[in-house]
Amino acid sequence: MAKVIGIDLGTTNSCVAVMEGTTPKVIENAEGARTTPSIVAFTDDGERLVGQPAKRQSVTNPERTFFAIKRLIGRTYDDPMTKKDMGLVPYKIIRASNGDAWVEADGKQYSPSQISAFILQKMKETAEAYLGQPVSQAVITVPAYFNDAQRQATKDAGKIAGLEVLRIINEPTAAALAYGLDKKGAGVIAVYDLGGGTFDVSILEIGDGVFEVKSTNGDTFLGGEDFDVRLVEYLADEFKKENGIDLKKDKLALQRLKEAAEKAKIELSSATQTEINLPYITADATGPKHLTLKLTRAKFEALVDDLIQKTVEPCRKALKDAGLTAGEINEVVLVGGMTRMPKVQEVVKSFFGKEPHKGVNPDEVVAIGAAVQAGVLQGDVKDVLLLDVTPLSLGIETLGGVFTRLIDRNTTIPTKKSQVFSTAEDNQTAVTIRVFQGEREMAADNKLLGQFDLVGIPGAPRGVPQIEVTFDIDANGIVNVTAKDKATNKEQQIRIQASGGLSEGDIDKMVKDAEVHAAEDKKRRELVDARNQAEAMVHSAEKSLTEFAGKVSDADKSALEAAIASVKGVLEGEDVEAIKARSNDLAQASMKLGEAMYKAGAEAGPQEGGGAEKDDVIDADFKEVGPDDKKKSA
């Protein structure tokens, strides 16, 4: 039976593992190493190098050596994080025809999925050489905070590499699987995962083979690469002070600085001081220049302290979302190479109030967890159930631009949720479903994932048609949205495509803005709610005036018309209290009209309210499609 492999596709290094019976095994590559640098290079004669061979020649070939490509996967060219990356890497990042960020070497363009596929192919070949048989299926890990576009792009990379990706699994969850596989008893663990390019924290409850993620948070543009950049900038600045030459303008020198910075960073995890020695780093009219500098651990920690502190807030949010305190965490598991740094361990210990668990290899534990999940899918690993979550809320835009959530963040996946909405106008025959993701109260402040139309709705008074909107998130965290007219059973659906995915900048902005603007959001939500209620009352009152025009006195009619005009007069304003007050006046006038009608005694029986709105139906901000297929605003 063919084996399913587990792959940790990392920013800096990648790793592959497989289950041997009930035991996961990390597979060594052709160079004899258990991890492979996530680097792809193209030589002068067009040869493609992957892993250690690519890394070895990076200093002399910086413009055709692609590293940290994971930071670009699933991102658009205009993404702020892409712009940031452009200033950090020596290779060329370009705008693809679809607006995505791609890379270029020797006039050839490559998508990040393609470059990632070359790394995955190396992992595949490593596994095949060890197993002695072809491998066609894999479980691949991604940061827990990866968005839909990034997950889709990772699946694409697997497909390009010739792998059927059976499951996309979150890295902290994979680490928890590896950690908890042979543990007895129940407990709550926090997985602190600071890798080469991303940071994640997940809170999980483990017991009796069940791994349930309670919450997750993170930053997909924070990791070891940023620590390297800080050190490179420091070295370049020190060299400029001493020699008056800016090494930042020399790509070859920058690549040597990066290599030296990475080496120094690693050495300072075990030593308190290291020496950086780069002879012939550059030259000027006076001759060759050399860079020699002693770097202490304390100085390095000072350079990157703010980066380490940036990991604390996501930890705090994850605990809050899980409804737990730091004291309720039984164990903190460290994942990712950067967690070897003593200062990182110190910050983790300070926040959680306990010594972090160091019993797992931070470079290998994610791949091991992926192999365990592969074993579960293949049936080799029994009695293990994994329950993961979606990192952000999902919903649609409804009347007044409000974001109506169907699925809240940190909901266990796979999940499916339906809600019934209705039309905003009489005789509306089509609606536009606009799908958003985020945490803000107003749809416009969140990320538009996509939109689609549901047409052919039978004409009816507003509020009568029933449109069922269903969100379906699969175990990979990939979203499907369906809308169905319950009267005709007509249905439309959209699968959120990679081009419509979220950027990391968007995710961070959504969550941070949600906190900063919480009060503002609440005020705007109250205003929209008040307007919606007022407009509904105006609609109802005007309808009553039309239907019972000949059955009420001129005085009652004038009073109601005045109340309607009064409400309309404040609707465009921003004063919530004024809208509520005028709406209350209109409600009183409507009641008096009703009382007057009953006192007068209606000749006919009870009137049929053909367009009565149902309490459990939410008005949606949809658009009407006329006979000429041109949409009008609702």
UniProtKB/Swiss-Prot annotation:
Induction: By stress conditions e.g. heat shock. One of its GO terms (molecular function) is unfolded protein binding. Keywords: ATP-binding, Chaperone, Nucleotide-binding, Phosphoprotein, Stress response. Residues 600-634 are annotated as: Disordered. It holds the Pfam family HSP70. The keyword Phosphoprotein applies. Gene3D superfamilies: 1.20.1270.10, 3.30.420.40, Actin, Chain A, domain 4, Substrate Binding Domain Of DNAk, Chain A, domain 1. The modification Phosphothreonine is found at residue 198. Residues 611-634 have a biased composition (Basic and acidic residues). Acts as a chaperone. Belongs to the heat shock protein 70 family. NCBIfam families: PRK00290.1, PRK05183.1, prok_dnaK. This is Chaperone protein DnaK. It comes from Methylocella silvestris (strain DSM 15510 / CIP 108128 / LMG 27833 / NCIMB 13906 / BL2).
